[in-house]
Amino acid sequence: MSRAELDKNPRDVASMFDGVARRYDLTNTVLSLGQDRYWRKATRSALGIGPGQKVLDLAAGTAVSTVELNKSGAWCVAADFSVGMLAAGAARRVPKVAGDATRLPFADDVFDAVTISFGLRNVVDTQAALREMARVTRPGGRLVVCEFSTPSNALFATVYKEYLMRALPRVARAVSSNPDAYVYLAESIRAWPDQAALADQIAGAGWAGVRWRNLTGGIVALHAAHRPPR
């Protein structure tokens, strides 16, 4: 699977991530020039979580993001539909659950906060996933979506697109266990909605108070919202 225009069949997407799991964390750090660590810290800060709270880290992959969230003192569970990714993070001692973002294996209103980092773009039905996140979050609970976005500076945006389509696949061939998956990555980023459009989608799924801020010049955006009362 290497084209962003395909139907994002959950089995195909899970298989793709199973194929990159072994070197996934290293590849991400190399391709992001180390910015992935900063993005994880920013996500934890935006959630505003603390001891005694329950947090769902959706599309958690190898659970490196969950470990960062754990630094808050909250109880955090990693969920992903790629069993291979969860297995690659077996050494990270956090609870792990295999599950589809559009059919989460959790009861209603159980989490104080939910976050998804670089995973919403890969879900077959974005609105269904956002509604499921709202379902499992208590009223007043928080959502943070960390996702690739659109650089705010036009010149920077042009340079970034060139990096995505030309340099990124070449670097991936050198460090990734499945370079074709990163061709899909580049194309899916280009096809993804910008900051305002994603904010509209989040609000349309029932979340309130949607706002965003850019990281790394808009390469990544953090969208935050809260679950309104019933």
Curated annotation (Swiss-Prot):
GO biological process: menaquinone biosynthetic process; methylation
GO molecular function: demethylmenaquinone methyltransferase activity
A matching Pfam family: Ubie_methyltran
Keyword Magnesium: no
Entry keywords, A to Z: Menaquinone biosynthesis, Methyltransferase, S-adenosyl-L-methionine, Transferase
InterPro entries (UniProt xref): SAM-dependent_MTases_sf, UbiE/COQ5_MeTrFase, UbiE/COQ5_MeTrFase_CS
Catalytic activity, EC: 2.1.1.163
SUPFAM superfamilies: S-adenosyl-L-methionine-dependent methyltransferases
Keyword Methyltransferase among UniProt keywords: yes
Pathway recorded for this protein: Quinol/quinone metabolism; menaquinone biosynthesis; menaquinol from 1,4-dihydroxy-2-naphthoate: step 2/2
Reactions catalysed according to its record: a 2-demethylmenaquinol + S-adenosyl-L-methionine = a menaquinol + S-adenosyl-L-homocysteine + H(+)
Binding annotation for S-adenosyl-L-methionine: 62, 80, 100-101, 117
Family affiliation: Belongs to the class I-like SAM-binding methyltransferase superfamily. MenG/UbiE family.
NCBIfam families for this protein: MenG_MenH_UbiE (TIGR01934), PRK00216.1-2 (NF001241)
Cited function: Methyltransferase required for the conversion of demethylmenaquinol (DMKH2) to menaquinol (MKH2).
HAMAP family: MenG_UbiE_methyltr
Protein name, UniProt field: Demethylmenaquinone methyltransferase
Record organism: Mycolicibacterium paratuberculosis (strain ATCC BAA-968 / K-10) (Mycobacterium paratuberculosis)
Gene: menG
